[in-house]
């Protein structure tokens, strides 16, 4: 069934094991291994899809459509179900927690490159005017990435009368200058 002239091909069972990915991505593999989650790297980043083994014409005609690994290496499609926010105003403090709920390794994670989460907080008064702002960068190189299923807490002292906090979380992959929106939240006092 595997025909790809002019060379022989075979199926290597190691390609569907997370240990295969771990040979290069040691840090991320160690994070994943520590979670005890059984899903493999390939299940998330290379989900199976119905396609031909090779897509180059005319060799593609030699193969039937079957379940093969998606080689787009999906990543970074985070949303509010992945990173949870708990927040409250308490006196002169604004406290909040972030929780990586679904990604079974640190977010972001990298053995190479510098992916980042950017957290922007804007504080507004009753009139809707900005009275303060802050930014956090969550990155593996700074040891500030969000571990799987562990709350990370932040606390800000408020020096002005604040009615609400607008929070924006963005993700920047290691190979992009673009920051993609993960979610936006408004917390009222």
Would you name each region that the model predicts?
Residues 1-160, 173-188:
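Primarily the internal scaffold of c-type cytochrome electron-transfer domains
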Residues 162-164:
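Extracellular Ig-like/FN3 beta-sandwich strand-entry sites
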């Amino acid at each position: 069934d595997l025909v790809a002239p002019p060379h022989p091909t075979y199926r290597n069972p190691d390609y569907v094991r997370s240990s295969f990915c771990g040979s290069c991505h040691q840090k991320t593999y160690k994070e994943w291994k520590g979670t005890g989650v059984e899903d493999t790297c390939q299940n998330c980043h290379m989900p199976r899809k119905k396609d031909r083994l090779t897509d180059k014409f005319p060799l593609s005609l030699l193969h039937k459509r079957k379940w093969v690994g998606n080689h787009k290496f999906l990543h970074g499609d985070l949303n509010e179900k992945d990173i949870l926010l708990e927040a409250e105003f308490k006196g002169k403090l604004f406290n909040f927690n972030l929780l990586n709920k679904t990604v079974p390794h640190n977010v972001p994670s990298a053995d190479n490159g510098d992916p980042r989460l950017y957290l922007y907080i804007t504080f507004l008064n009753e009139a809707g005017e900005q009275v303060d702002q802050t930014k956090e960068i969550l990155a593996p190189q700074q040891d500030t990435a969000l571990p799987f299923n562990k709350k990370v807490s932040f606390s800000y002292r408020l020096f002005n009368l604040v009615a609400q906090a607008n929070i924006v979380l963005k993700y920047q992959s290691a190979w992009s200058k673009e920051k993609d929106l993960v979610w936006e939240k408004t917390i009222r006092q």
